[in-house]
Amino acid sequence: MNRDIITGMDGEIYARRDLSREWGGAIDLGTARTGKSFGVDGHLGETNRCGVWDSVDRLKFRTSRNLRLELATDPNVITELVRFDSKGVATVVGSVEYGDRLSLNLTPGRYGLSFFVEGDLISYQVNASFIGNFGSETRPF
């Protein structure tokens, strides 16, 4: 069985036999800030250690200010970004099906990323970076 590896926003390494398919068990990468990034080196489309078909990987993070998320996605997976409301209900705010890029402006809140596959075993890579505030007012000198 292959391992999924996440390089977190502070350089921490998470290696798992498989990432959680449920939001409750998803790795929480913490609070995103300008200049931070993370990467996922994953595998999907095989039976996991619990004997369940592994077709989705999930992870979570949050923002405390307006940030732009730039995702270099893998063309072999469907990528969805969700936002959680105060009750923990997830709503899709952006997605790309078998594309290589997803860029979104994020407001403060809790978010999650899902990576899906419809076929057999694949390896995939996703890299994310957070870029400065958007929508901030500029003060005259």
Where do the protein language model's features map onto the residues?
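Non-catalytic extracellular/lumenal accessory regions of secreted precursors
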Residues: 1-68, 74, 129-141
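Acidic, Ser/Thr/Pro-rich low-complexity intrinsically disordered segments
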Residues: 1-2, 42-123
